[in-house]
Regions:
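N-terminal mitochondrial targeting presequence
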Residues: 1-29
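Active-site and donor-binding regions of nucleotide-sugar-utilizing enzymes
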Residues: 33-209
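A nucleotide-sugar donor-handling region in carbohydrate enzymes
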Residues: 171-263
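Core catalytic architecture of nucleotide-activated donor-dependent transferases building glycoconjugates
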Residues: 219-248, 254-309, 390-394, 398-415
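Conserved donor-binding/catalytic loop of nucleotide-activated donor transferases
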Residues: 324-326, 344-348
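C-terminal amphipathic helix plus adjacent low-complexity
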Residues: 357-415
Length: 415
């Protein structure tokens, strides 16, 4: 009698679901983003999540501070202390809404965004772990540090916590820290020279980056080739007919490390008028941080020029279209995010006002100039000249390091 040959049991190559092949609890398929309400910080988190393939599988939470009136003077406090103090002040005086209305302040509606609550996020991570696997937590901004570190402390077996920007606390409170190199400027010889000896022990960071720190050149963001292709298509009708070269001007606002006012506005408008002959079109955008005195000067000097269009701030925001269709960029030196996005396109980027920057901002601009990524805007340029460089690719490189860190833990992201 001939033996009966039974079929071999199925193997992974025969279509076993990936989650079982890798282990039931080792695949990350969702993320939580913890923001602070500032576009520059939240954009970095969403950009990383997008690069990791979880753009459609993340939930945004926010750590919100009271705003308006005396609250603008209390931002140096830890957010929990600030909220308690604001509550006491409101109970004592009871007229905060009337005061805001009298000053013309509009309430900020965040009803569509969840308030970041450590207990809620930890409970969700624990209770859904067996069904949905580990939870990726990505946070950015000073107010998110205590929230993100508490989540890791309370649910370390169920979460992987990434903090973007140096948290100025012990880095072992997070699984991974992604921060620009210029955050370590205080440890450089140039930085040390600018710090009095008695203050050096108090200036953070105090130690060089260790193995779970990812260093970037600039800020993370959502701009990649796919985003640019999509924006080019969406804005084709508006930008394709414009005379070339199209020069996009992005104006930010002064910061603690980059102070300026009407002086920079006058410098910028003078330089733009000088290069106008070599421009086909100029598109100018202001940010929410742009002081009115700056925007007024620019509008007065350039608003009636037929080659110039100034965005009025109404939706839709043309920013993505600008990145896709511009032939060159002029960006104020204060905005690391805007400069990083422009430098991800490989197109000419000119920076105005870098000489007004101090501290770590000088290190950032120096690194870009040394790489040939940016040039100073002097007003003597021929804007039709095209030059290029290897585009900054910080977001993709940071995402790759996240993959590596997860693999060391035996986890991985959904394919």
């Amino acid at each position: 009698m001939r033996p009966i040959r039974l079929p071999e049991p199925p193997t992974q190559t025969m279509g076993v679901p990936e989650i079982f092949a890798a282990g039931a609890y080792s695949v990350i398929r969702r993320a939580v983003v913890i923001g602070n309400g500032y576009p520059g910080s939240e954009n970095q988190c969403v950009g990383l999540v997008r690069a990791l393939g979880l753009s459609d599988k993340h939930v945004l939470y926010r750590v919100t501070r009271p705003r308006g009136g005396i609250n603008e003077w209390l931002h140096w406090l830890p957010v929990s202390v600030h909220k308690k103090l604001e509550y006491v002040i409101r109970q004592i005086f009871g007229y905060s809404r009337l005061l805001s209305a009298a000053r013309g302040e509009k309430p900020v509606c965040l009803s569509s965004v969840l308030e970041a609550d450590v207990r809620q996020i930890v409970t969700m991570a624990r209770e859904t772990y067996e069904k949905d696997g580990p939870l990726l937590v990505v946070a950015s901004g000073r107010d998110t540090i205590s929230i993100a570190s508490s989540i890791k402390r309370l649910a370390s077996d169920n979460v992987f916590v990434v903090q973007i920007q140096h948290p100025r606390v012990h880095l072992n409170r997070f699984d991974l820290v992604i921060t620009p190199r210029h955050d370590y400027y205080p440890l450089t010889p140039e930085g040390q020279e600018k710090i009095p000896q008695f203050l050096r022990r108090w200036i953070t960071p105090c130690e060089p980056p260790d193995g779970h720190v990812v260093l970037t050149t600039g800020a993370l963001h959502q701009i990649d080739s796919a985003a640019l292709r999509s924006a080019a298509s969406a804005w084709h009708e508006e930008f394709a007919p414009l005379p070339k070269p199209l020069v996009v001007v992005n104006v930010g606002g002064p910061t603690g490390c980059c102070r300026y006012g009407s002086d920079l506005a006058k410098q910028l408008t003078a330089h733009l008028l000088n290069v106008l002959v070599s421009c086909g079109s100029i598109r100018i955008s202001f940010s929410m941080r742009t002081p009115e005195k700056v925007s007024k000067i620019i509008i007065k000097e350039l608003g009636n020029n037929p080659k110039v269009h100034i965005w009025d701030g109404e939706e839709p925001n043309p920013h993505l279209g600008h990145l896709a269709w511009a032939d060159a960029f002029v960006v104020t030196a204060d905005s690391i995010s805007l400069i990083s996005e422009a430098c991800s396109t490989g197109k000419p980027v000119y920076v105005v006002g870098a000489e007004r920057c101090t501290w770590k901002f000088t290190d950032f601009h120096k690194s870009l100039r040394e790489r040939g990524v940016v040039r100073p805007f002097t007003g003597s340029e021929d804007m039709s000249d095209s030059w290029s460089y290897p585009p900054l690719n910080d977001t993709a490189e940071a995402a790759s390091r996240v993959h590596e860190a997860l693999a060391e833990r035996g986890w991985k992201l959904r394919p």
